[in-house]
């Protein structure tokens, strides 16, 4: 009897999670009924999100019907929770409920949302439906619908959708064009290589960047000469071009136009010349670290905290929270700064960088703690007058919430609102999140590089959980294409900043403790 009891206990504790978490049809319907009964009564975001996430196990068509209403909720976090749950559903009947009405659906916002969540969930059945949606509704599709179709084909594979993707690369909305280029590159649709090459002349730099990346993935030999010529243009795209050229040729001359031009002109004329195979490229990539000193040589670069950039449109985001008033511990690293206070060290680095800027580099500065303060409303050129103004602003910066002057530690002004600072950098309202406009003239879209410096974890704001912040930044940067370099100073575990940099094409640097 005791042995039988032990066996039962072991089964309860160690049974597969899928068995334990499975719900019967009756349980699923009951969970949905209780959700619908109480959801409107809850006023707090946290309660609503928790209730939505509880429907993960209720993988049934009725749960889809209940969550459809939530997808229109005014709260961004609530809507995101509903998308997350829907993307996780796998039961055939549940998936069919989401797919069933897509072709004839009149609500463009709802259709685009279902396309998003189904593709996030890896539902290959969506591809057949997308063809029907396109054939029947092509002329009436909204910007958001076309954007989500392109993103879905990037996730699920664009093979067989060349005609649709080609049409999307010609859309008037730049977000749609770059999403289509991403899908072409990810799916390596070599039939469209010539069309992608033509996109190097797109008027929006983000679309040019997507075309450059796609050409690198397609390994289109005819793109080499035009890419080399584009190295003569100033700005951050030089780095993207150098990477694409490496992926096509397996050569590594960085942004050095003269070396690329000389080598390509000589070798491409040889009889029997060909670009390396994928296997040869993979081998070259493994050996690349040995030649990092050569990568990026040629051309003047600006540098902040040891991170170089060819960008001519830069934003510096600096933490001035209370903890920036602390002294560094490892003082041997900071002997040349005249002060061991963290903010003084950062101010010295930033001042040095600003002094080095030329009139062709446009820049701005944001200081943040609990709230965000911009030096200017827009990017300005590195002229003598603007640099003098910037240096004066830098000199005036002091940690907030330290008890000095009108600030006190108790007023909450010295906390770290990382999310608000990043949204200010993107020129977005934290409460609204990502909004597709199709407008490429917005001033924020001119920015292409951010240097983000902080000494602590997020402690206040709409989002403080690092996963939430990373998710929101990723959604925004799918169309912005801004490189985010991250710098930490002080006794701060930097895994968040490392990921923020890595996921956004940047470099992470730890200045020291």
Predicted regions and their residues:
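Alpha-helix N-cap/helix-start positions at coil->helix boundaries
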Residues: 44-46, 61, 76-80, 92, ...
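Short, charged loop segments at secondary-structure junctions
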Residues: 326-336, 340, 369-424, 428, ...
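Amphipathic alpha-helical scaffolding segments comprising HEAT/armadillo-like alpha-solenoid repeats
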Residues: 25-38, 60-72, 91-104, 123-137, ...
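…and closely analogous acidic/polar surface helices at protein-protein or active-site interfaces
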Residues: 312, 323-365, 379-386, 466-467
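Structural signature of alpha-helical solenoid repeat scaffolds
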Residues: 53-56, 87, 119, 154, ...
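Conserved hydrophobic register position within alpha-solenoid helical repeats
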Residues: 51, 82, 114, 149, ...
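VWA/integrin I-like adhesion module and closely mimicked acidic/polar interface patches used
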Residues: 437-448, 454-504, 509-511
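Acidic, polar low-complexity linker/tail segments
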Residues: 264-335, 373, 442
